[in-house]
Regions:
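Charged/polar positions within long, soluble alpha-helices
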Residues: 147, 151-154, 158, 223-230, ...
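Short, charged, amphipathic alpha-helical segments
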Residues: 133-137, 209-212
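Glycine- and acidic-residue-rich phosphate-binding/metal-coordinating active-site segment common to enzymes
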Residues: 179-238, 245
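Active-site-adjacent scaffolding segments
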Residues: 146-198
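Terminal targeting/low-complexity segments that flank the catalytic cores of oxidoreductases
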Residues: 1-133, 155-162, 169, 234-238, ...
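Alpha-helical transition-metal enzyme core signature, strongest for iron centers
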Residues: 108-116, 138-153, 179-190, 214-225
Length: 345
């Protein structure tokens, strides 16, 4: 892997020039040249995983110190890897079959493209210059994720359906909330599945390691989103806070409805993609030859979630909803398993 200057598609009019200018400043702080030494790359990777604010004392949600810490974390943990020169390893026929069979590629590429648009659109509505710049950087990084995925599918000959046209969202805040919460859900389960793939050896370690920076970057993204939520909530007047919380509830309902609709669409005979609508559950069998139960997968997701967040300042907020639900499911599952075990005796 190497370090790179950013490339932004200037044909996309929404704040593209602002994103390019801001992220370019991040690159000028690092080493120059097309390729960096292994030591520099390792240092950049390490910096992306460990960060503590220089601000002493409590980081009270909504305070200026909290805001400065959030934005500094995102800026200072930036990892300038270059998608265009990622070394995609050669796969044998069985490894290639496994990779192509993963039912995620169309959705993954489209999701990153939509996230880029939604984040950039919301950035335009943010008055605070620090938060605006950080959300613009997030939009740029979403675009980089799409580049990584596009290069991967091209390298391995994975065919994708034509992408739908992405339109500027009519309600940028709604789009930002839906995207942020959706990423928080998907990343939680992706952490566990990714580690399962690493442990199983089902895919070459070179491929897993090549994709690792993207996984950690997703952790940074949802860490920022969780803290943006805390900061935003704390700075709303009480009547706007009520409206916002009702909107958050509506977002969760909307996401659930989208997932149900996606499942129905993928189960239909007309679906050419034949993608698995329950990949989070069944996906474990696609990345390991060993049978993995749902509760075991939940435990692994929790462990990986905790591990990836462990390097960041403990005073920053963490995503709580999905981990709490996973712990509840684990608790109920263990209780039920124990109850059945006692009855069997």
């Amino acid at each position: 892997m190497s370090l790179d200057r950013p490339q932004v598609n200037s044909s996309e009019g929404y704040v593209a020039s602002e994103i390019e200018a801001y992220v370019s400043n991040l690159f000028t702080q690092g080493p120059s040249g097309d390729f960096a030494s292994d030591a520099i790359i390792e240092a950049a990777d390490r910096k992306a995983r460990h960060w503590t604010s220089a601000e002493g004392g409590e980081l009270r949600a909504g305070s200026d110190g909290h805001k400065q810490a959030i934005c500094a974390m995102f800026r200072e943990t930036f990892n300038p890897y270059r998608p265009s020169v990622m070394a995609w390893p050669i796969l044998n026929s069985e490894e290639l079959r496994r990779l192509k069979s993963l039912p995620i590629w169309d959705i993954a590429v489209q999701t990153e493209g939509r996230a880029r648009l939604n984040f950039a659109a919301y950035a335009q509505s943010v008055a605070d210059p620090d938060m605006r710049a950080t959300i613009m950087q997030n939009a740029w990084e979403e675009n980089r994720h799409k580049e990584v995925l596009s290069n991967l599918v091209a390298a391995y000959g994975i065919s994708l359906r034509e992408e739908p046209e992405f339109r500027h969202p009519r309600d940028p805040e709604w789009a930002y909330l839906v995207t942020g919460y959706s990423e928080s859900i998907d990343s939680f389960f992706a952490f566990g599945l990714f580690d399962l793939a690493r442990r199983s050896g089902f895919f070459p370690m070179e491929l897993v390691e090549t994709f690792e920076p993207v996984m950690q970057e997703e952790c940074r993204h949802i860490l920022f989103f969780a803290n943006w939520l805390a900061w935003h909530r704390a700075n709303l007047r009480w009547y706007r806070r009520i409206h916002f919380e009702l909107r958050v509830i509506a977002v969760w309902v909307h996401i659930a409805w989208l997932r149900i609709g996606m499942a129905r669409m993928m189960d239909s005979p007309e679906s050419a993609a034949h993608q698995d609508n329950n990949f989070t559950i069944n996906g474990a069998q696609a990345v390991t030859p060993v049978a993995v139960g749902f509760l075991e997968l939940m435990q692994l997701c929790l462990m990986e979630n905790d591990r990836r967040f462990a390097g960041y300042d403990s005073r920053l907020s963490r995503p709580t909803t999905i981990p709490a639900l996973a712990r509840f499911v684990l608790g109920v599952g263990k209780f039920w398993t124990g109850l059945l075990g006692r009855r069997a005796r």
